[in-house]
């Protein structure tokens, strides 16, 4: 994430005399992201963080995975080209309902976990 790596974009921006904007970042290590944000700031490039909440740590607020979430994911990734495949893959509906309701509850901001490393990598502070 160095200036040299994005120099072609910087030259283009300068040649057309228009601002440059990085649509989204957030899918790398905290160290890489911190260096990349610094490079963009030093070169007057705006950027957006992606996304606000997720299940892992590449976000501002982490969502705790509810019990049986692995079954929800297994169903979502199972073959469903035929009715038989759908029926064969269909998990217990009460377990799935509870897992989905728990996910909704865990997604509320007050139940999320601040991802301090990610936040610091963007040059921001946690209060």
Predicted regions and their residues:
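Substrate-binding cleft of secreted/luminal carbohydrate-active enzymes
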Residues: 3-126
């Amino acid at each position: 994430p160095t200036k040299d790596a994005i120099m072609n974009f910087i030259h283009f921006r300068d040649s057309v005399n228009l601002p440059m904007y990085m649509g989204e970042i957030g899918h790398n290590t905290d160290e890489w992201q911190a260096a990349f944000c610094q490079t963009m700031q030093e070169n007057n490039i705006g950027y957006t963080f992606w996304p606000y909440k997720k299940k892992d740590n590449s976000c501002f607020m982490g969502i705790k995975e509810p019990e049986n979430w692995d079954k929800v994911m297994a169903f979502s990734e199972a073959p469903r080209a035929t009715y038989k495949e759908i029926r064969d893959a269909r998990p217990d509906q009460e377990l799935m309902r509870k897992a989905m309701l728990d996910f909704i509850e865990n997604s509320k901001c007050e139940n999320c976990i601040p991802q301090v490393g990610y936040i610091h990598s963007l040059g921001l502070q946690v209060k």
